[in-house]
Amino acid sequence: MKDEQKQEIILYGYRDSLMLYDEGLSIDDIKEVLQLYEERELYLTCAGIKLAIDELIDKYGNDTFRN
């Protein structure tokens, strides 16, 4: 797999996670999504999801429930 393809998969996980957050999922919910991808060994997507989680925690804190 080419580096461009790998980067595209990582960005997919990142953007999709941010979209899920914008649609109302909590960071904990997104962590559960991450576990599902880890179980399926889709590690490039996991990398993107982890980037999004880290960014969301930095920006909003580690919310268990959305307000």
Region spans (language model):
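Hydrophobic/aromatic side-chain positions at a characteristic register within alpha-helices
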Residues: 38-41
